[in-house]
């Protein structure tokens, strides 16, 4: 298994958020987690990404406990688009997408090329120099998707890569919902 949640439980503020969750995710497959609002889907994603430690169980990434990978190594293998992303700094779209390149040391020229490619992939290249704070909700969502794509744009020597998306189409119009699902499907095949 490349990404494994082994007997995950999460107890917070007196509530059982997750209880005995077991999931195996292999590369090349799309795994969808569905459930009603408040069921713990976003909390599970935070456990998978290492943002929250489980009360019980462990997450295994590429045959190694998630906690045994350094933050930089994890960031080169797992890219997460959270349900809500806020950014109140005067960054333009290119600068936001470039944040996904921070864990890499591929050089400014290569990173600039990847940023442009990622923006084009999500149909947001026209937003390149627009400030993030001046974008619509759907435009922000596409720029953030470009950021997480840029983060795993190139293969890494440390192991398989995973894209974890929490409600990635929630703010998108229909055509960009279709585009997002197409991008995810194509990534799963590579």
Which residue stretches match the model-derived regions?
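Conserved structural motif at the start of ABC-family nucleotide-binding domains
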Residues: 3-5, 18-20
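ABC ATPase NBD coupling module
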Residues: 65-79, 89
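Catalytic Walker B motif of ABC-type/P-loop ATPase nucleotide-binding domains
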Residues: 157-167, 172
């Amino acid at each position: 298994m490349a990404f494994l949640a082994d007997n995950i439980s999460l107890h917070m503020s007196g509530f059982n958020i997750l209880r005995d969750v077991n999931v195996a995710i292999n590369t090349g497959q799309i795994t969808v987690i569905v459930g009603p609002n408040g069921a713990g889907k976003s909390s599970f994603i935070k456990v998978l990404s290492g943002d929250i430690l489980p009360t019980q169980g462990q997450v295994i990434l590429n045959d190694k406990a998630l906690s045994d990978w350094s933050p930089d190594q994890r960031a080169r293998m797992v890219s997460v688009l959270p349900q809500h992303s806020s950014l109140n700094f005067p960054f333009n779209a290119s600068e936001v997408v470039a944040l996904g390149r921070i864990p890499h040391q591929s050089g400014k020229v290569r990173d600039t090329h990847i940023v442009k490619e990622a923006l084009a992939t999500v149909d947001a290249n026209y937003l390149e120099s627009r400030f993030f704070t001046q974008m619509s909700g759907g435009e922000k969502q596409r720029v953030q998707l470009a950021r997480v794509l840029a983060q795993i744009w190139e293969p890494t020597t440390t192991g398989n890569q995973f894209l974890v998306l929490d409600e990635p189409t929630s703010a998108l119009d229909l055509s960009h919902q279709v585009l997002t699902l197409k991008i995810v499907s194509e990534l799963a095949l590579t």
